[in-house]
Amino acid sequence: ESHTMTGFARRAAAGLLAAVFGISMLAGCTPNNAAVGDTQSAGDAVAHSMKDRNSLDVAMIGSQDEQTDRLALDAMEAGGLRPVYLPVAGTVDMQDTARQAVEDMAQRMVSIIVISGIDVSGVNHDGWYDTLTTARQAGIPVALLNPIATPTDSALFAATLTINDRMTDATPFADAVAGIANNDPHDRTILVTTISHGGKQ
């Protein structure tokens, strides 16, 4: 008899989870067991108001590689986004500066946070977990651009974006960022290009 009970309880729990998941996605809250902005199939996508790109608040947290940061910023602007850039190069502890910037942007309730060159390892590990959890609880999707080391907890970020400008079929950077911000279906790992459609760099 206990066997049937478990089966029933499991089904009930699954149903409850589905209901909670559905409601939380609609409310724009934190989804269960998945990153904010991590919709991988069209079936999971909840109807959302497609914000105009220029009304998306995109925060980009810099890295020590300012050249790559600049390419990414230019590509976002070329694609109709208006990113706010928070540089960290030249600061005493760049990962710590980046974490502070993420927490500031989470408080400002931006649409998406793009973190360049994140290194979730060693002394930075626990601090990054706390910071990314703060963004998650605020319901803000996080995309990791050219990460050095990512968190093992995949619920803490929506996707990694790796720039590959030699790939002709890579996703335009602005499209990837806008898609994640709007919770469109996307892969966990996205190869992006900073070269605009016009063929000019």
Sequence positions of predicted segments:
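N-terminal export and membrane-targeting signals
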Residues: E1-A19
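Bacterial signal peptide processing site
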Residues: L26-N33
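Short beta->alpha junction loops
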Residues: Y85-D96, D119
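Short, well-structured alpha-helical segments in soluble
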Residues: R99-S111, T131
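Short beta-strand elements of ligand-binding domains
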Residues: V114-S116, G139-A149
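Catalytic-core regions built around general acid/base machinery
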Residues: N124-G139
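Glycine-rich, charge-decorated loop segments at or immediately adjacent to ligand/cofactor-binding or catalytic sites
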Residues: L144-I163
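A charged, well-structured terminal subsegment
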Residues: A170-G198
